């Protein structure tokens, strides 16, 4: 999983969207949704490209924000959105074991400690994972 987020970070860092207005994704990152609902809602609002830019062996699909979309999570800038739902045609399947039946999240610019502090203060049960210095994943999963 660390390899995935690092790859996403490097690939998308140069493709940051042009700012128009910020859309906060704090509520869905309280981990009360399915991977399908999270990704479908963002795609329907045209905030992410509905086709994944990358699929990891654990079936996590990475989606890019659309041009002009300024997505935030707990005050941190989002540069990648990830998700997966088992047996859902919206997602492509990797060649390994899926991470979970349903999973979703975002990759943000921010230190692990600051992101963890913001998530804890908000009462979210999301998992925080350091990808690289100042690049952190916020992740929700259901088995």
Task: Label every model-predicted segment.
Residues 1-4:
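Positively charged n-region of N-terminal signal peptides that target proteins for export
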Residues 7-15:
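Bacterial N-terminal signal peptides
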Residues 16-22:
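Sec/Tat signal peptide C-region and signal peptidase I cleavage site
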Residues 23-31, 106-107, 136-143:
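Short, extreme N-terminal segment that most often corresponds to the first beta-strand
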Residues 23-81:
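N-terminal secretory signal peptides
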Residues 53-59, 95-101, 127-135:
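Short, ordered beta-strand-loop transition motifs
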Residues 65-121:
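Long, charged/polar, surface-exposed segments that mediate recognition or autoinhibition
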Residues 116-143:
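C-terminal partner/receptor-binding element of secreted or periplasmic proteins
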């Amino acid at each position: 999983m660390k390899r995935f987020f690092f790859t996403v970070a490097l690939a998308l860092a140069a493709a940051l969207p042009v700012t128009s207005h910020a859309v906060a994704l704090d509520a869905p990152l309280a981990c009360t949704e399915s991977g399908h609902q999270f990704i479908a809602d963002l795609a329907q609002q045209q905030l992410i490209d509905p086709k994944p830019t990358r699929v990891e062996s654990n079936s996590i699909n990475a989606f890019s924000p659309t041009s002009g979309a300024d997505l935030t999570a707990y005050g941190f800038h989002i540069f990648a959105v990830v998700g997966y739902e088992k047996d859902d045609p919206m997602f492509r399947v990797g060649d390994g074991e899926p991470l979970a039946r349903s999973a979703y999240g975002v990759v943000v610019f921010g230190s692990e400690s600051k992101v963890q502090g913001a998530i804890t203060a908000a009462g979210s049960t999301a998992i925080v994972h350091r990808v690289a210095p100042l690049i952190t994943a916020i992740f929700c999963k259901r088995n």
